[in-house]
């Protein structure tokens, strides 16, 4: 189930990160924790907090709330393995510990976690969500945070050769996202 897949992914990410965290530091293994809250039609629901990622090879419905943050959903239709991340910033300051709060870390970690869970890299398909400019004061400023988050996600996916098959990005309103790991379906509602 999701917990067994999560344990395998955590072990893989721990090895890949190659760091022993000091007290208070986030590890790659910590970002795959998930928060189950109910089931719908027998499918477990999970809520994904910012700075985390979720991967499962079994049916699961994952939801999150996005403003300027971005979520990348990846899905392998053959292996039926899917995952979602939720990052806050395009990249972290220099000499910052690796964290899924940053797009430059969260997107590669998500790719690696899906491969560790049985997905084939060449079969992955991406969907990108979020990146709104929700603060009125920044709506006229070129290069707002949401736009930068979207640009980082798209650049990494392009560099990895992963096609973006759907997106709902930018704008001025937040979004509620629901993603199904077993079939790649996604629903978005403006907030």
Predicted regions and their residues:
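Divalent-metal-activated hydrolytic enzyme cores
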Residues: 146-191
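Phosphate/ribose-phosphate-bearing ligand recognition and processing surfaces
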Residues: 135-147
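Conserved mixed alpha/beta catalytic, RNA-binding, or beta-rich assembly cores of soluble enzyme
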Residues: 62-117
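Conserved active-site and cofactor/substrate-binding residues in soluble primary-metabolism enzymes
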Residues: 48, 79, 101-105, 109, ...
């Amino acid at each position: 189930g999701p917990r067994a897949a999560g344990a395998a992914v955590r072990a893989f990410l721990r090895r890949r990160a190659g760091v022993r965290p000091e007290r208070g530091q986030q590890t790659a293994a910590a970002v795959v924790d998930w928060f189950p809250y109910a089931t719908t039609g027998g499918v477990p629901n999970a809520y994904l907090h910012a700075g985390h990622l979720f991967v499962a090879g079994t049916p699961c419905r994952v939801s999150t709330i996005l403003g300027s943050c971005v979520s990348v959903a990846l899905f392998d239709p053959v292996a039926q393995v899917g995952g979602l991340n939720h990052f806050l910033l395009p990249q972290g300051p220099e000499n910052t510990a690796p964290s899924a709060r940053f797009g430059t870390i969260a997107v590669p970690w998500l790719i690696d976690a899906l491969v560790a869970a049985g997905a084939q890299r060449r079969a992955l398909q991406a969907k990108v969500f979020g990146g709104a400019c929700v603060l009125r004061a920044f709506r006229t400023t070129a290069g707002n945070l949401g736009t930068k988050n979207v640009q980082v996600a798209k650049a990494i996916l392009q560099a990895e050769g992963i096609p973006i098959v759907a997106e709902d990005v930018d704008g001025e309103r937040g979004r509620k996202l629901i993603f199904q790991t077993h079939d790649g379906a996604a629903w978005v509602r403006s907030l």
